[in-house]
Amino acid sequence: MTTASQQTSSHSTASSTSRKGNNNDATPSLKELQLANRTLGTRNAKLVEMLKASRDKLDALNEQIRALSDPPSTYGTLLELNPGGHSAEVFTSNRRMRLVVAPGVDTSQLTPGALVRLGEGQEVVEHCGFSDFGDIAVVKEFLPGGSRVVVADTMGDLRVLKIAAPLYELWSQKNVGAGDQVLVDYRAGYAFESIPKADVENLILEEIPEVSYEDIGGLHNQIEMIHDAVELPFTHPDLYRKFDLQPPKGVLLYGPPGCGKTLIAKAVAHSLAEKMGSGGESYFLNIKGPELLNKFVGETERQIRQIFDRARSIAEDGRPVIVFFDEMDAIFRTRGSGISSDLENTVVPQLLSEIDGVEDLRNVIVIGASNREEMIDPAILRPGRLDVKIRVERPDEKSAREIAELYLVDTLPLDPALVEETGDRHAAVAALIDELSSRMYAQHSDNEFVELTFVDGSREVLYYRDFASGAMIANIVDRAKKNALKRALASGQPDNHGVSLEDVRTAVDQEFAENDDLPNTANPDEWARISGRTGQRVTEVTVAHHNRKTTTETEATEPEGTDSGKGHTDAS
């Protein structure tokens, strides 16, 4: 009994132990649970991201569906916002309509002329700025009040339009006026903004010149003549009316190149600005003459019209305006003189009509400059058009000294030895100017330029001084300064060097040497005009190359302009 009972108890204990061991093997460990938790968390995060992306994509698709289902928008031009701001007059679909303004629209932006978007029910739902495309028109005048403007279309027909806010702002600041181009919508009846006239502006240098008469040397007589012709009518109009005098419409400055024609014209504008008392404002319209020429028929004439429209618009405010045509012979040649073109047959009459139209504008004058005055059409030069003709001569020795004084001043670095020798800096500068003028105008063999032989056998020698100009003198002074600068750099002691007499001598020689090969001997008759003996023909031009001579001679046996093979050119 005892043994059987013990066996039963032992078996029960073993069974219990066996079950306990099996339960421990089936239970996961803590690490396993943590790993499983992290895995599930990662999967859950990915699912959340995928769900969010799917939701965003679904929203985008729904938005596209809604956009595709929306009706198309209509745009119009706001004409007027009615009192209360709940309705507005809008021009749309070629008709004027009174439409409701949707709630939420900022009515402060709804200014006349604005572009607005209309909803499905033809209500104003959005302000879209101002139209940036349309037709181009030219302003004729702004009507009193600043709300309307008279413009001319491409056919010259006049229209009255209302002014949008951007253009009104320009008008109130006096930044737009007669002659300017504006963007318009003829159907809506509005002008929106000013459009730059690129095709004309690139030909015009509109400025208030800073050149005064004191900046011009050796041209006292010419300055006095242009002062009497241009400034007196502007500054004393009452006296001109009292003496029953008409101010000149134009002035022609003619003479050799580089002698100050453009400087005189600029100085006139500067002087007028100081004397007119118009806030110091004067305008100098410097026309780049050759660029006016255009291969398209009528373009040159149109640009001339626009230039004078510009001048008139500026002059209306009482400001003096000078229209300056440089190289006038390039644009307004004698009619019928063209070889392969008859452009001058239409360009010259256009200028004549514009000059004749200037008679009622007291503040506009035309100044032309040319070194080939004989090529300008005579109709332009007759009294009543370019009334005053002023020849700008080449500088003589006295004038050359005056010009040199503008460039050689005592503030420049001067040669210490020269300053010590002359006594002070003023005397040193005077010595430099004496050396420059005496060397330029010396009448000796080293300064011979060309020798002319006339048809009667007489001869005349032209020297470098006969071809002097203000530009040449300025260039010689610059050469002398550069020579001194290079010597100072080479010495390593720049403070101990300055412009010397030798620098001036070298500069004059360098300038003359560069001109040795420049004389044009192909047409000897041109030299008769240069020498002033226009009554005789030149048959031979001998060019001096220092110690060398190159001869160009004319022979009666060959046609004009042909080379005989002996260094001669026919002029008979």
From Swiss-Prot:
The entry marks the following residues as binding ATP, namely: G258, C259, G260, K261, T262, L263
Mark out the compositionally biased spans (Basic and acidic residues): 563-572
**What residues form the membrane-spanning segments?**
none
Its BP terms in the Gene Ontology are: modification-dependent protein catabolic process; proteasomal protein catabolic process
Question: What UniProt keywords apply to this chain's record, in alphabetical order?
Answer: ATP-binding, Coiled coil, Nucleotide-binding
Pfam families given in the database record: AAA, Prot_ATP_ID_OB_C, Prot_ATP_ID_OB_N
Q: Which domain of life does the UniProt lineage start with?
A: Bacteria
| Gene3D superfamilies per UniProt | 1.10.8.60, 1.20.5.170, Nucleic acid-binding proteins (2.40.50.140), P-loop containing nucleotide triphosphate hydrolases (3.40.50.300)
Parts forming coiled coils:
42-70
Q: Where is the composition biased (Low complexity)?
A: 1-18
Q: Does the keyword ATP-binding apply?
A: yes
Q: Name one GO molecular function term.
A: ATP hydrolysis activity
In residue numbers, the region (Disordered) covers: 1-30, 543-572
Which InterPro entries has this protein been placed in?
Answer: AAA+_ATPase (IPR003593), AAA_ATPase_domain (IPR050168), ATPase_AAA_core (IPR003959), ATPase_AAA_CS (IPR003960), NA-bd_OB-fold (IPR012340), P-loop_NTPase (IPR027417), Prot_ATP_ID_OB_2nd (IPR032501), Prot_ATP_ID_OB_N (IPR041626)
Q: Which GO terms describe its cellular component?
A: proteasome complex
**Family statement drawn from the similarity comment of this UniProt entry:** Belongs to the AAA ATPase family.
Q: Give the multimer and partner information.
A: Homohexamer. Assembles into a hexameric ring structure.
Name this protein carries in UniProt: AAA ATPase forming ring-shaped complexes
Organism field: Corynebacterium kroppenstedtii (strain DSM 44385 / JCM 11950 / CIP 105744 / CCUG 35717)
